[in-house]
Curated annotation (Swiss-Prot):
Main location: cytoplasm
PANTHER family: RING FINGER PROTEIN 32 (PTHR14991:SF0)
Zn finger intervals (RING-type): 127-169, 293-352
SUPFAM superfamilies: RING/U-box
Lineage start: Eukaryota, Metazoa, Chordata, Craniata, Vertebrata
Molecular function per GO: zinc ion binding
Record's protein name: RING finger protein 32
IQ domain sequence ranges: 186-215
Disulfide bonds: none
Length: 362
């Protein structure tokens, strides 16, 4: 009887151990406690399913202005642990068949893990999953001292359905949000901005120095003063008013004035003088008692009233509408050599007025 009892107790222990191991494997495969996954969704859904009547409150308008409390700004550089509370021990862990999970790390232990990560330079290097810089995106430190993007680790846990480190394959790691990558990225950006600003300041200072201080080399000095002279000439040219439209308007105005003057002159000198007017002009010329041509300074009529047949044309006189008398040949020569007069508008050699002429014979 004792042998049968001992044999049955061993079978019971084996059965309990087998059930405990199976239960532990099921719990391990279900991954109920992923560190980065949002474990509070179920609680939020439960709160949303509550009746809305509990949230409805009567609002009384008293006319008084309520003081709005500004929300407290949380420290963006604050580090915190993402892991929820550790799950209860499974039956296999309680029986000692499998070792219990490691306890949550303390602050000192997390500091050691962080120092080990800094020595490895994980925050300086890109994320091992997406191969991109950490920049200002959320960064997660694992208990194995490896660093990843929070979104990358969350996607890795979702698609692998396991809680193992992507690098060292450590199971059931703990996670903590850190900001070393963001801090290093800000330092890098500040360094770039400062370097760019210093470069701009130095280049501006050097350009001003080159504009004001001439070089010592002869060729460079010559180019320096040539450039200065070119700049001065350009400024002088730019200072002039080159309004072409105004110049064209002034030219058109001058042409209009000239046309009006010529039109008045044509109206004055263009009409034909009648015989009666010529007689009056001839009487006025006789009153002048002019005896010599003002062009050749020779007498207007031959001495003693003699006439030479060959030189008859040379003795012809021209009476002008201004009552001046000249030799016809002298007047023709003057008209041929006059510059600037436009026929038939010639100017009298004495009074400079436009004239019409009539040929008189001595």
């Amino acid at each position: 009887m004792l042998k049968n009892k001992g044999h049955s107790s061993k079978k019971d222990n084996l059965a309990v151990n087998a059930v405990a191991l199976q239960d532990h494997i099921l719990h391990d495969l279900q991954l109920r406690n992923l560190s980065v996954a949002d474990h509070s969704k179920t609680q939020v859904q439960k709160k949303e399913n509550k009746s809305l009547k509990r949230d409805t409150k009567a609002i009384i308008d008293t006319g008084l202005k309520k003081t709005t409390q500004c929300p407290k700004l949380e420290d963006s550089e604050k580090e915190y642990v993402l892991d929820p509370k550790p799950p209860p021990l499974t039956l296999a862990q309680k029986l000692g068949l499998i070792g219990p999970p490691p306890p949550p790390l303390s602050s000192d232990e997390w500091e050691k893990v962080k120092q080990r990560s800094l020595l490895q330079g994980d925050s300086v290097q890109p994320c091992p999953i997406c191969k991109e810089e950490f920049e200002l995106r959320p960064q997660v430190l694992l208990s194995c001292s490896h660093v990843f993007h929070k979104a990358c680790l969350q996607a890795f846990e979702k698609f692998t359905n396991k809680k193992t480190c992507p690098l060292c394959r450590k199971n059931q790691y703990q996670t903590r949000v850190i900001h070393d990558g963001a801090r290093l990225f800000r330092i890098k950006c500040v360094t770039r901005i400062q370097a760019y600003w210093r470069g701009c300041v130095v280049r501006k200072w050097y350009r001003n120095l080159r504009k004001t201080v001439p070089p010592t080399d002869a060729k460079l000095r010559k180019k320096f003063f040539e450039k200065k002279f070119t700049e001065i000439s350009h400024r002088i040219l730019c200072s002039y008013n080159t309004n072409i439209e105004e110049l064209f308007a002034e030219i058109d105005q001058c042409l209009a004035i000239n046309r009006s003057v010529l039109q008045q002159l044509e109206e004055k000198c263009g009409h034909e003088i009648t015989e009666e007017e010529w007689e009056k002009i001839q009487v006025q010329a006789l009153r002048r008692e002019t005896h010599e041509c003002s062009i050749c300074l020779a007498p207007l009529s031959a001495a003693g009233g003699q006439r030479v047949g060959a030189g008859r044309r040379s003795r012809e006189m021209a009476l002008l509408s201004c009552s001046h008398v000249f030799h016809h040949a002298c007047l023709l020569a003057l008209e041929e050599f006059s510059v600037g007069d436009r026929p038939p508008f010639h100017a009298c050699p004495l009074c400079r007025s436009c004239y019409q002429k009539k040929i008189l014979e001595c």
